[in-house]
Amino acid sequence: MQEHIADMFGIEERLKEKGISVDSMVTSAMLLYVPHGLSAEEATHKIREKIIRYLRDPNVASLLLGAILLEDELYLRQKDSGIQEDPVFLISDEIIGMAIAECIGGTYARFEFTRYDQKKPGILATLGPFLDDAVAGLIAGCTSRLYSECC
């Protein structure tokens, strides 16, 4: 039942429509990977598995859907909304990213989210204010969980 709910959101397909593939997220994750007893090849494989798994989690999927819809509305449709440059007063995007990270990796993932949010490796540098933080949260949650499982 849980997978069916997440699948009805079509998150992986919606992200692909925005130019965000699983491969691009894995590549971005590996740009800030901190070796933890796994080879880069092993870590890449495990991060890919985690990203795919958590794209199907209904809580993560619904937060990602929220970020997609907010970005479509405020960044693309309402071009005079003032959020194109990710203004300081806009914090809901970070809240979504942190929530995704914590859903997956717990409190430690919040710190991992900060690394990805600040450095914006790979695909993150090309995304708007909501999707960069939502995808950073997904990556951070998955890498944080990987680090806690392998150490």
How should these model regions be labeled?
Residues 4, 18, 40, 44, ...:
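Intrinsic-disorder-associated interaction segments
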Residues 27-31, 65, 96-106, 137-144:
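Short, hydrophobic/amphipathic alpha-helical patches that form generic packing surfaces
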Residues 44-116:
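Long, charge-patterned amphipathic interaction tracts in eukaryotic proteins
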